[in-house]
Amino acid sequence: PQLTTVVEATHRWGAKICCQISCGTGRNAFPNMYGEPPFSSSDTPSTFNPEMKCRPLSKEDIKKIMTEFANSAIIAKNAGFDAIEIHGHAGYLVDQFMSPVWNKRTDEYGGSAENRMRFATEIVQSIKQAVDLPVIFRIALDHLFAEGRTLDESMELIEILEKAGVDALDIDAGCYERIDYIFPTAYLGDACMDYVCKEARKHVNIPIMNAGNHTPESALRLIESKDADFVMFGRQFIADPDTVNKLMSDHEEDVRPCIRCNEECVGRIVGRLTKLSCACLL
Protein backbone atom coordinates (compact mmCIF):
# COMPACT_ATOMS: atom_id res chain seq x y z
CA PRO A 1 0.00 0.00 0.00
CA GLN A 2 2.81 2.46 0.80
CA LEU A 3 4.47 1.84 -2.57
CA THR A 4 1.17 2.36 -4.35
CA THR A 5 0.66 5.65 -2.50
CA VAL A 6 4.06 6.91 -3.68
CA VAL A 7 3.44 5.78 -7.26
CA GLU A 8 -0.03 7.32 -7.43
CA ALA A 9 1.25 10.62 -6.04
CA THR A 10 3.98 10.65 -8.69
CA HIS A 11 1.63 9.80 -11.54
CA ARG A 12 -0.84 12.42 -10.36
CA TRP A 13 1.64 15.08 -11.48
CA GLY A 14 2.40 13.44 -14.81
CA ALA A 15 5.78 11.99 -13.85
CA LYS A 16 7.18 8.48 -14.26
CA ILE A 17 8.68 6.50 -11.39
CA CYS A 18 11.23 3.67 -11.34
CA CYS A 19 11.76 1.10 -8.58
CA GLN A 20 15.38 0.25 -7.79
CA ILE A 21 15.91 -3.32 -6.56
CA SER A 22 19.08 -4.46 -4.79
CA CYS A 23 20.26 -7.73 -3.27
CA GLY A 24 22.35 -5.85 -0.74
CA THR A 25 25.79 -4.52 -0.05
CA GLY A 26 27.68 -7.80 0.22
CA ARG A 27 31.16 -7.18 1.58
CA ASN A 28 30.27 -3.52 2.17
CA ALA A 29 27.84 -4.44 4.96
CA PHE A 30 28.93 -3.57 8.48
CA PRO A 31 30.17 -6.87 9.99
CA ASN A 32 28.22 -6.32 13.20
CA MET A 33 24.98 -5.55 11.36
CA TYR A 34 23.73 -9.15 11.28
CA GLY A 35 26.07 -10.80 13.76
CA GLU A 36 27.74 -12.94 11.11
CA PRO A 37 30.10 -12.47 8.14
CA PRO A 38 28.63 -10.66 5.12
CA PHE A 39 27.87 -12.54 1.91
CA SER A 40 29.91 -11.95 -1.24
CA SER A 41 30.82 -13.68 -4.49
CA SER A 42 33.94 -15.13 -2.81
CA ASP A 43 35.66 -15.23 0.57
CA THR A 44 37.05 -11.73 0.11
CA PRO A 45 37.77 -9.52 3.15
CA SER A 46 34.96 -7.43 4.56
CA THR A 47 35.30 -3.78 3.54
CA PHE A 48 35.00 -2.41 7.06
CA ASN A 49 36.76 -5.26 8.87
CA PRO A 50 39.46 -6.77 6.62
CA GLU A 51 40.21 -9.42 9.24
CA MET A 52 36.77 -10.92 8.62
CA LYS A 53 36.28 -13.03 5.49
CA CYS A 54 32.96 -12.93 3.65
CA ARG A 55 30.87 -16.04 3.10
CA PRO A 56 30.63 -16.95 -0.61
CA LEU A 57 27.11 -17.36 -1.94
CA SER A 58 26.25 -20.97 -2.76
CA LYS A 59 24.39 -21.90 -5.93
CA GLU A 60 21.30 -22.43 -3.79
CA ASP A 61 21.72 -18.92 -2.38
CA ILE A 62 21.95 -17.58 -5.92
CA LYS A 63 18.77 -19.39 -7.00
CA LYS A 64 16.94 -17.93 -4.02
CA ILE A 65 18.14 -14.42 -4.91
CA MET A 66 16.82 -14.84 -8.48
CA THR A 67 13.42 -15.81 -7.10
CA GLU A 68 13.45 -12.83 -4.75
CA PHE A 69 14.27 -10.45 -7.62
CA ALA A 70 11.35 -11.84 -9.63
CA ASN A 71 9.00 -11.53 -6.65
CA SER A 72 10.18 -7.98 -5.98
CA ALA A 73 9.61 -7.08 -9.62
CA ILE A 74 6.04 -8.37 -9.39
CA ILE A 75 5.44 -6.26 -6.28
CA ALA A 76 6.81 -3.21 -8.14
CA LYS A 77 4.62 -3.94 -11.16
CA ASN A 78 1.51 -4.36 -9.02
CA ALA A 79 2.28 -1.08 -7.25
CA GLY A 80 2.28 0.67 -10.63
CA PHE A 81 5.96 1.47 -11.14
CA ASP A 82 6.93 2.35 -14.71
CA ALA A 83 10.35 0.68 -14.76
CA ILE A 84 12.77 -1.33 -12.64
CA GLU A 85 16.42 -0.56 -11.98
CA ILE A 86 18.90 -3.24 -10.88
CA HIS A 87 21.51 -1.96 -8.43
CA GLY A 88 24.81 -3.29 -9.82
CA HIS A 89 26.79 -0.29 -8.62
CA ALA A 90 29.36 0.87 -6.07
CA GLY A 91 31.00 -2.46 -5.36
CA TYR A 92 27.77 -3.87 -3.90
CA LEU A 93 26.95 -7.58 -4.17
CA VAL A 94 26.13 -7.65 -7.90
CA ASP A 95 29.33 -5.73 -8.65
CA GLN A 96 31.27 -8.19 -6.50
CA PHE A 97 30.35 -10.87 -9.03
CA MET A 98 31.14 -8.71 -12.06
CA SER A 99 34.61 -7.64 -10.92
CA PRO A 100 37.66 -9.95 -10.81
CA VAL A 101 39.14 -7.99 -7.91
CA TRP A 102 36.39 -9.51 -5.72
CA ASN A 103 35.21 -12.53 -7.73
CA LYS A 104 37.61 -15.46 -7.25
CA ARG A 105 35.08 -18.20 -8.03
CA THR A 106 36.03 -21.21 -10.13
CA ASP A 107 32.49 -22.29 -11.08
CA GLU A 108 30.23 -20.91 -13.82
CA TYR A 109 29.92 -17.61 -11.92
CA GLY A 110 33.64 -16.78 -12.03
CA GLY A 111 36.58 -16.52 -14.39
CA SER A 112 35.69 -15.12 -17.81
CA ALA A 113 33.71 -11.93 -18.31
CA GLU A 114 30.72 -13.98 -19.47
CA ASN A 115 30.85 -16.07 -16.30
CA ARG A 116 31.35 -13.10 -13.99
CA MET A 117 28.35 -11.44 -15.61
CA ARG A 118 26.17 -14.53 -15.23
CA PHE A 119 24.83 -13.44 -11.83
CA ALA A 120 23.81 -10.06 -13.28
CA THR A 121 22.32 -11.44 -16.49
CA GLU A 122 20.32 -14.05 -14.58
CA ILE A 123 18.86 -11.22 -12.50
CA VAL A 124 17.88 -9.42 -15.71
CA GLN A 125 16.28 -12.59 -17.08
CA SER A 126 14.44 -13.29 -13.81
CA ILE A 127 12.87 -9.85 -13.88
CA LYS A 128 12.08 -9.97 -17.60
CA GLN A 129 10.33 -13.32 -17.17
CA ALA A 130 8.29 -12.00 -14.25
CA VAL A 131 7.10 -8.61 -15.56
CA ASP A 132 6.87 -6.61 -18.78
CA LEU A 133 8.58 -3.46 -17.51
CA PRO A 134 11.70 -1.73 -18.86
CA VAL A 135 14.83 -2.79 -16.97
CA ILE A 136 17.61 -0.30 -16.23
CA PHE A 137 21.00 -1.43 -14.93
CA ARG A 138 23.04 0.81 -12.63
CA ILE A 139 26.79 0.24 -12.96
CA ALA A 140 30.01 2.11 -12.20
CA LEU A 141 32.18 1.87 -15.30
CA ASP A 142 35.39 2.99 -13.61
CA HIS A 143 36.20 1.91 -10.05
CA LEU A 144 39.03 4.44 -9.79
CA PHE A 145 41.35 2.39 -7.60
CA ALA A 146 44.42 0.40 -8.61
CA GLU A 147 42.97 -3.13 -8.58
CA GLY A 148 39.48 -2.12 -9.65
CA ARG A 149 37.70 -2.38 -12.98
CA THR A 150 38.74 0.21 -15.54
CA LEU A 151 36.58 2.07 -18.02
CA ASP A 152 37.98 0.02 -20.90
CA GLU A 153 37.32 -3.27 -19.10
CA SER A 154 33.72 -2.27 -18.44
CA MET A 155 32.87 -1.95 -22.12
CA GLU A 156 32.60 -5.71 -22.57
CA LEU A 157 30.31 -5.87 -19.56
CA ILE A 158 27.81 -3.32 -20.83
CA GLU A 159 27.74 -5.09 -24.20
CA ILE A 160 26.80 -8.29 -22.35
CA LEU A 161 24.10 -6.43 -20.44
CA GLU A 162 22.59 -5.07 -23.63
CA LYS A 163 22.52 -8.56 -25.16
CA ALA A 164 20.86 -9.86 -21.98
CA GLY A 165 17.94 -7.49 -22.55
CA VAL A 166 18.76 -4.45 -20.43
CA ASP A 167 16.77 -1.49 -21.77
CA ALA A 168 18.93 1.38 -20.46
CA LEU A 169 22.17 1.93 -18.54
CA ASP A 170 22.64 4.17 -15.50
CA ILE A 171 26.41 4.78 -15.50
CA ASP A 172 28.97 6.64 -13.44
CA ALA A 173 32.21 5.89 -11.55
CA GLY A 174 33.52 4.93 -8.12
CA CYS A 175 33.00 2.29 -5.43
CA TYR A 176 33.50 2.03 -1.68
CA GLU A 177 37.27 2.00 -2.14
CA ARG A 178 36.73 5.48 -3.62
CA ILE A 179 33.87 6.58 -1.43
CA ASP A 180 34.47 10.21 -2.38
CA TYR A 181 32.84 9.30 -5.71
CA ILE A 182 29.89 7.62 -4.01
CA PHE A 183 29.01 10.93 -2.32
CA PRO A 184 30.90 13.38 -4.56
CA THR A 185 31.76 16.66 -2.90
CA ALA A 186 32.30 20.09 -4.41
CA TYR A 187 36.02 19.38 -4.60
CA LEU A 188 35.45 16.89 -7.44
CA GLY A 189 33.92 19.61 -9.60
CA ASP A 190 30.84 19.73 -11.80
CA ALA A 191 29.81 16.64 -13.79
CA CYS A 192 32.74 14.69 -12.34
CA MET A 193 31.57 11.38 -13.80
CA ASP A 194 30.26 12.35 -17.22
CA TYR A 195 33.55 11.24 -18.81
CA VAL A 196 32.35 7.60 -18.81
CA CYS A 197 29.55 8.38 -21.26
CA LYS A 198 31.53 9.06 -24.43
CA GLU A 199 33.20 5.63 -24.42
CA ALA A 200 30.03 3.82 -23.41
CA ARG A 201 28.14 5.41 -26.30
CA LYS A 202 30.50 3.67 -28.74
CA HIS A 203 29.64 0.21 -27.38
CA VAL A 204 25.87 0.13 -26.80
CA ASN A 205 22.75 1.26 -28.60
CA ILE A 206 20.45 1.54 -25.59
CA PRO A 207 19.76 4.80 -23.70
CA ILE A 208 22.46 6.06 -21.33
CA MET A 209 21.81 7.88 -18.05
CA ASN A 210 24.43 9.71 -15.98
CA ALA A 211 24.69 11.30 -12.54
CA GLY A 212 27.38 12.94 -10.44
CA ASN A 213 27.62 16.61 -9.41
CA HIS A 214 25.60 17.84 -12.36
CA THR A 215 24.36 21.39 -12.63
CA PRO A 216 21.57 22.41 -15.01
CA GLU A 217 24.28 23.75 -17.32
CA SER A 218 26.41 20.59 -17.29
CA ALA A 219 23.31 18.45 -17.78
CA LEU A 220 22.35 20.43 -20.87
CA ARG A 221 25.87 20.17 -22.29
CA LEU A 222 25.93 16.40 -21.83
CA ILE A 223 22.55 15.93 -23.48
CA GLU A 224 23.52 18.18 -26.37
CA SER A 225 26.75 16.20 -26.85
CA LYS A 226 24.57 13.10 -27.41
CA ASP A 227 26.89 11.08 -25.17
CA ALA A 228 23.96 10.56 -22.78
CA ASP A 229 20.20 10.57 -23.10
CA PHE A 230 19.25 11.41 -19.52
CA VAL A 231 20.98 13.28 -16.70
CA MET A 232 20.00 12.63 -13.10
CA PHE A 233 19.94 14.79 -10.01
CA GLY A 234 19.81 13.47 -6.45
CA ARG A 235 20.98 15.83 -3.74
CA GLN A 236 19.98 18.80 -5.90
CA PHE A 237 16.33 17.84 -5.37
CA ILE A 238 16.89 17.84 -1.62
CA ALA A 239 18.34 21.35 -1.83
CA ASP A 240 15.53 22.52 -4.11
CA PRO A 241 12.65 20.15 -4.93
CA ASP A 242 11.34 22.81 -7.34
CA THR A 243 14.47 22.77 -9.52
CA VAL A 244 12.82 21.44 -12.68
CA ASN A 245 9.78 23.69 -12.42
CA LYS A 246 12.03 26.74 -12.07
CA LEU A 247 14.11 25.70 -15.08
CA MET A 248 11.03 25.02 -17.21
CA SER A 249 9.57 28.42 -16.34
CA ASP A 250 12.85 30.22 -17.22
CA HIS A 251 13.70 31.08 -13.62
CA GLU A 252 17.16 29.52 -13.51
CA GLU A 253 18.36 32.30 -11.22
CA ASP A 254 15.93 31.13 -8.53
CA VAL A 255 17.31 27.58 -8.34
CA ARG A 256 18.89 26.92 -4.94
CA PRO A 257 22.06 24.93 -5.77
CA CYS A 258 23.28 21.97 -3.78
CA ILE A 259 26.65 22.92 -2.27
CA ARG A 260 27.68 19.22 -2.04
CA CYS A 261 28.70 19.41 1.59
CA ASN A 262 27.00 16.09 2.48
CA GLU A 263 26.47 17.36 6.03
CA GLU A 264 22.70 17.25 6.42
CA CYS A 265 21.81 14.61 3.80
CA VAL A 266 24.42 11.83 3.69
CA GLY A 267 25.79 12.90 7.06
CA ARG A 268 22.45 12.55 8.80
CA ILE A 269 21.65 9.16 7.30
CA VAL A 270 25.08 7.50 7.49
CA GLY A 271 26.66 9.29 10.40
CA ARG A 272 23.76 10.12 12.68
CA LEU A 273 21.02 7.71 11.54
CA THR A 274 18.42 10.47 11.44
CA LYS A 275 16.09 11.81 8.75
CA LEU A 276 17.77 13.74 5.98
CA SER A 277 17.69 17.48 5.62
CA CYS A 278 19.86 19.99 3.74
CA ALA A 279 22.43 22.54 4.84
CA CYS A 280 21.10 24.82 2.10
CA LEU A 281 17.80 25.03 3.98
CA LEU A 282 19.21 25.86 7.40
Q: Which stretches of residues belong to each language-model region?
A:
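Flavin-dependent oxidoreductase catalytic cores
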Residues: 1-282
